[in-house]
């Protein structure tokens, strides 16, 4: 009886527990480690706005917005709650004083552009296509001023013609070591200015910039960190001088103009070169180029700053019985004007010198000097040898005949 009772009791416990378990795993409770997103509602659609008043009010309420027309504002848009601003191919222009956007209170502002190819007409015809943020003028951060603890995710749109009257970033300022900028996609910063030429026309960074894509035209003052997000498929392209200050670290990015380095460089691609002014460049910023002579000698290695060109060796290698024809990368002759962006092994190619076989004779056609020896063979000539032998035999025969007669 006891053996039968135990399985029955276990079955009853299981049946009673199933409804409770089902309710638990489908509750959507974020503390549930198995199904933490069940029942979660999607984010609300952005509010369509076509004028400054609706834009200001929606942002004040913490609502994401989508521009449906060009909008002119006269005062800074204060972002104190996390939201998304979709420029949607339109122009957001500041005509008063101050930054166009200021992010505070640990908020996250995401800027997107649903229509990056949308052309502009009329008074905006000279602006780049797509969504545009323009006209800001402030002490620092003419376009966007990002306070410490805040995050800007710039995935699209163009920040252009914004100005900082001081040295701090005509385009974007990361004001504090806890400010974070993610730049990616089609985002661009261009034609911005700052009060000091050594300052930051485009970006003044005291925090962390994730250079995951987009383009920056103009100078950058880096006193924080420039790096990549984990798994990022692209890098931001910097087309102006970058001043890497003593507190600055560069770990990623493509730099088409000079980087003036007083800080630390551990990675990146430096097509414009680096001027090192007391800074440090770690091995991670270099690539190794091997020269394999294929002549029995040990391959030579050279460290090249990533993005720079490797110099062609001044002396060609040598190999007995061969002529050197050049350095090759795979099956193609290497172009030494190519920037090095990855490890390379260059191999010497050789052409075998053809060997000459048989006898070599010297047969002059004219007698240019009295003391020249005509017809002098360089090696034994069978014809000449035969002629000499017959001559000797003939003389010997004549001698013998003469002796018999006497």
Positions of predicted regions on the chain:
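Beta-strand-rich solenoid/repeat architectures in extracellular/passenger domains
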Residues: 89-97, 114-140, 155-168, 184-201, ...
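Glycine-rich repeat segments that build the extracellular carbohydrate-interaction surface of secreted
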Residues: 49, 58-73, 83-90, 325-328
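Acidic Gly/Asp/Thr-rich repetitive segments characteristic of extracellular carbohydrate-active
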Residues: 30-68
């Amino acid at each position: 009886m006891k053996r039968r009772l135990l399985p029955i009791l276990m079955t009853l416990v299981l049946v009673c527990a199933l409804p409770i378990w089902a309710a638990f795993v489908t509750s959507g409770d974020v503390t549930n480690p198995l199904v933490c997103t069940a029942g979660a509602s999607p984010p609300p659609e952005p509010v369509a706005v076509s004028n400054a008043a609706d834009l200001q009010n929606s942002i004040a309420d913490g609502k994401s917005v989508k521009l449906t027309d060009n909008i002119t504002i006269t005062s800074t848009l204060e972002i104190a709650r996390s939201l998304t601003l979709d420029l949607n191919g339109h122009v957001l222009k500041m005509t008063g004083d101050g930054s166009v956007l200021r992010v505070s209170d640990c908020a996250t502002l995401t800027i997107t552009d649903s229509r990056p190819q949308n052309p502009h007409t009329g008074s905006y015809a000279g602006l780049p296509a797509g969504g545009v943020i323009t006209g800001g003028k402030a002490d620092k951060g003419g376009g966007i001023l990002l306070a410490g603890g805040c995050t800007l995710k710039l995935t699209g749109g163009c920040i252009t013609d914004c100005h900082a009257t001081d040295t701090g970033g005509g385009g974007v300022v990361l004001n504090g070591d806890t400010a974070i900028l993610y730049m990616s996609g089609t985002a661009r910063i261009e034609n911005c200015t700052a009060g000091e030429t050594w300052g930051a026309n485009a970006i003044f960074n005291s925090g962390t910039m994730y250079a995951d894509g987009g383009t920056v035209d103009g100078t950058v003052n880096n006193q924080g960190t420039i790096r990549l997000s984990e798994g990022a498929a692209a890098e931001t392209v910097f087309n102006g001088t970058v001043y890497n200050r003593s507190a600055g670290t560069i770990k990623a990015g493509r730099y088409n103009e000079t980087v003036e380095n007083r800080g630390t460089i551990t990675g990146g691609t430096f097509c414009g070169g680096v001027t090192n002014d007391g800074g440090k460049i770690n091995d991670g910023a270099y690539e190794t180029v091997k020269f394999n002579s294929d002549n029995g000698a040990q391959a030579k290695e050279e460290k090249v700053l990533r993005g720079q060109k490797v110099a062609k060796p001044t002396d060609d290698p040598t190999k007995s019985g061969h002529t050197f024809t050049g350095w090759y990368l795979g099956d193609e002759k290497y172009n030494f004007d190519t920037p090095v962006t990855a490890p390379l092994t260059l191999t010497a190619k050789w052409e075998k010198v053809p060997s000459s076989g048989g006898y070599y004779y010297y047969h002059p056609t004219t007698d240019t000097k009295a003391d020249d020896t005509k017809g002098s063979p360089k090696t034994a000539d069978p014809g000449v040898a035969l002629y000499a032998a017959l001559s000797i035999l003939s003389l010997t025969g004549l001698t013998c005949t003469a002796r018999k007669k006497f």
